[in-house]
């Protein structure tokens, strides 16, 4: 990697670059520019990736703080502009509407490392808007957006302890290098040969250049869709040790990106403004609350049950606040915040000193586990997974592949055959609240569970269905997202989906502090909601018994030693193995498909026969659908998906399609029980086979007698037993009626029987 300092390219326009060297995979250049666009924003930076991908990030701040807020009002928005890809939006009004799922997930990737980088107690509204203006279809813009947002915030004159660098690294294998190489900013094409990829964000805590000490702040990682086939081909599996190596490999790249942002800020940053901060409480308030509550609260926090513990804690809180409130009139909010801070202190002390947790468990203990399938009667697949007081219902629905979600965003994905939706109703925590469209958190949790399961799903050739998985968080006390992974695995198997391997997930936590003069770290397995809130790290790991399929990490620390992180990963693997054993007791192989699930079969027809199967204006395919009740979807490569509520209907449709695409030509002398499909002045057309009609001339219809009108003898829809009298050189078939004759039966065919051949 090479280093460049920021330069002034035009009057008031500055830029800096970070060149990422991936060895044999080439270099990527990230360029930051400020001073040209969006000059009224507090900070505005354009970030380029190799000059073709271009994002504008603008950071703004309100002039006056929101003193009544008890949280930091930071908003991050990502605007995908379709002109970035040279497209007109597909919506009715032909303009961009609500943000896509990709945009929402990118907002979360930006928010998670930026939010803890602001000074504690800030109450001014901060808004970061990232606009995707140009995008090379081989690039993914999310990590570029993290860097752009950090750079614009860094120069905005805000109390911000950045910059934050974000990088995507992928373990890409080749025939020559099965162990693989960690490549930064991989292209979409390169990711096809990757076994694992992750977005890592962090910042420099000391040093500079390649020797800088980088603190990891956020990780979002996943195994790729084709990881199992790559492993079968000899590639390195993404085990816990390999994932830890990837995190270390990302640090020099992050240092390079942070350095480029620092260089830009040195030239173009505004001086930090005077922003008032509103600490949650003053020291005198905390001292009073601690003196009054410490003993009672410590006792309350030893109660194992969540509801009983919360009730007792609330009781202590009311009692203590009534006791100390007269001494702090008008500072009620401080009292509540101090009580929460004391709770956090006591919980952490117990873990660090006694190695025991709120509910009495040891640091590696998992709460009681329960797994059950076939919960919802008419669902195609369902399961209930419980871990302590966390309860998740997973429900699987199968349908035709044409029901896959159509994705209209800037990402490379245009359709989603597997959709995972996560719902978190307010009653899951015993509260009231808004229900309706999903919040960003629900979209993020659903995406995490979706990524965890994608590597083990069968291909569309192996299982020609669209799959919708819904996770209902019925009760929550810690890591409903990882509970969703477990419930989904069970429900998918119950629905008959042939997963390549079962997947389970577990949430880990970390608590650290100075104990007896040294920093002590304690990794916690299966964290509670309170441990998540009061801990230093939230670390979710999902995977099979052999490798990691998804990982999400958020930390409040300036850095986690590699040894501690490796230990937490190993702890997570042990917990995952325990959970997989419990799940296997409920179901370990795919069940028979539900009688309520559609039967979908994939067949192939010659590409040049697609038009005949569809027919003029869809006449033939509509006819097959009407006669059989089956749903039919035809792909451009000749793959035909046939779905029906029962097997015989699907088979009838398949037979009719095969009769058209691979017809058995009728011969002179063959007899059929056909259907009259059209009458004319000169005769009646009779359908013998799908797509194959013959003509009975009017002179042959009267049994030797002259008739005036064809309709006097037959009408459309009439069944007529006929024999092929002649087939001319153009393939036109002449028919004659035959009498009902049992002796002729062996040589006769019905239209349906012929189709079954």
Swiss-Prot record:
PROSITE patterns: KH_TYPE_1 (PS50084), S1 (PS50126). It is found in: Cytoplasm. Residues 598-657 form the KH domain. One of its GO terms (cellular component) is cytosol. It is an enzyme of class 2 (transferase). Its EC number is 2.7.7.8. Mg(2+) binds at residues 532, 538. The keyword Nucleus does not apply. Pfam families: KH_1, PNPase, RNase_PH, S1. Belongs to the polyribonucleotide nucleotidyltransferase family. PANTHER family: POLYRIBONUCLEOTIDE NUCLEOTIDYLTRANSFERASE, POLYRIBONUCLEOTIDE NUCLEOTIDYLTRANSFERASE 1, MITOCHONDRIAL. This is Polyribonucleotide nucleotidyltransferase. It comes from Rhodococcus jostii (strain RHA1). The lineage of its organism: Bacteria, Bacillati, Actinomycetota, Actinomycetes, Mycobacteriales.
């Amino acid at each position: 990697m090479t280093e460049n300092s920021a330069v002034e390219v035009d009057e008031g326009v500055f830029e800096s670059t970070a060149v990422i060297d991936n060895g044999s995979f080439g270099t990527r250049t990230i360029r930051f520019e400020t001073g040209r666009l969006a000059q009224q924003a507090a900070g505005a930076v354009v970030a380029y990736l190799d000059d073709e991908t271009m994002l504008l990030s603008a950071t703004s701040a309100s002039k006056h703080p929101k003193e009544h807020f008890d949280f930091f009002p930071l908003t991050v928005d990502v605007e995908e502009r379709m002109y970035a890809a040279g497209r007109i939006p597909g919506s009715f009004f032909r303009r961009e509407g609500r943000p896509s799922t990709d945009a929402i997930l990118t907002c979360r990737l930006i928010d998670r490392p930026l939010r803890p980088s602001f000074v504690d107690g800030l109450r001014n509204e901060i808004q970061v808007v990232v606009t995707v203006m140009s995008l090379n279809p081989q690039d993914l813009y999310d990590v570029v957006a993290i860097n752009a947002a950090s750079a614009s915030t860094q120069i905005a004159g805000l109390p911000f302890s950045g910059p934050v660098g974000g990088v995507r690294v992928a373990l890409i294998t080749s025939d020559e290098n099965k162990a693989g190489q960690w490549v930064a900013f991989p292209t979409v094409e390169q990711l096809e040969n990757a076994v694992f990829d992750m977005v890592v964000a962090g910042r420099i805590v000391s040093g500079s250049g390649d020797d800088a000490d980088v603190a990891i702040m956020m990780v979002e990682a996943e195994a790729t869709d084709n990881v199992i086939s790559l492993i079968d081909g000899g590639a390195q599996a993404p085990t816990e040790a390999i994932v830890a190596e990837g995190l270390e490999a990302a640090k020099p790249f992050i240092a390079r990106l942070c350095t480029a942002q620092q260089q830009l800020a040195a030239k173009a940053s505004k001086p930090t403004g005077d922003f008032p901060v509103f600490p949650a409480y003053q020291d005198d308030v905390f001292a009073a609350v601690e003196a009054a509550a410490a003993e009672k609260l410590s006792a309350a926090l030893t109660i194992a049950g969540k509801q009983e513990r919360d009730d007792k804690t609330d009781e202590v809180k009311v009692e203590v606040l009534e006791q100390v409130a007269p001494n702090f009139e008008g500072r009620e909010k401080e009292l509540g915040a101090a009580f929460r801070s004391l709770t956090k202190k006591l919980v952490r002390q117990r873990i660090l000193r006694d190695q025991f947790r709120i509910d009495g468990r040891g640091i590696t203990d998992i709460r009681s586990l329960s797994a059950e399938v076939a919960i919802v009667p008419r669902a195609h697949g369902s399961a209930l997974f419980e871990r302590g007081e966390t309860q998740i219902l997973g429900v699987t629905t199968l349908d035709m592949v044409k029901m896959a979600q159509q994705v209209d965003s800037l990402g490379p994905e245009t359709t989603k055959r597997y959709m995972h939706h996560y719902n978190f109703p307010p009653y899951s925590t015993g509260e009231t609240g808004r229900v309706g469209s999903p919040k960003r958190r629900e979209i993020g949790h659903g995406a995490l569970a979706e990524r965890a399961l994608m590597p083990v799903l069968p291909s569309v050739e192996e299982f020609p269905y669209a799959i919708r998985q819904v996770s209902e968080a019925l009760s929550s006390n810690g890591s409903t997202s990882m509970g969703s992974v477990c419930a989904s695995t069970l429900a998918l198997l119950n629905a008959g989906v042939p997963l390549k391997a079962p997947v389970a997930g577990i949430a880990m936590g970390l608590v650290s502090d100075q104990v007896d003069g040294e920093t002590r770290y304690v990794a916690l397995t299966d964290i509670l909601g309170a441990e998540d809130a009061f801990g230093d790290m939230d670390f979710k790991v999902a995977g099979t018994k052999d490798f990691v399929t998804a990982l999400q990490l958020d930390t409040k620390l300036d850095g986690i030693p590699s040894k501690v992180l490796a230990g937490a990963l190993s702890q997570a693997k042990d917990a995952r193995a325990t959970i997989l054993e419990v799940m296997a007791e409920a179901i370990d192989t795919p069940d028979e498909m539900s009688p309520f699930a559609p039967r979908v079969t994939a067949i192939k027809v010659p590409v040049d026969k697609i038009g005949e199967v569809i027919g003029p204006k869809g006449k033939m395919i509509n006819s097959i659908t009407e006669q059989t009740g089956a749903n039919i979807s035809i792909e451009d490569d000749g793959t035909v998906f046939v779905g029906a509520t029962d097997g015989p209907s699907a088979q009838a449709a398949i037979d009719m399609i095969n009769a058209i695409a691979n017809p058995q030509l009728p011969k002179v002398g063959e007899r059929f029980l056909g259907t009259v499909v059209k009458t004319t002045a000169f005769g009646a057309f009779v359908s013998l086979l799908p797509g194959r009609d013959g003509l009975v001339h009017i002179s042959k219809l009267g049994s030797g007698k002259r008739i005036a009108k064809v309709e006097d003898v037959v009408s459309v829809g009439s069944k007529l037993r006929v024999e092929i009298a002649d087939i001319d050189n153009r393939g036109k078939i002449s028919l004659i009626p035959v009498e009902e004759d049992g002796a002729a039966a062996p040589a006769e065919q019905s239209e349906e029987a012929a189709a079954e051949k």
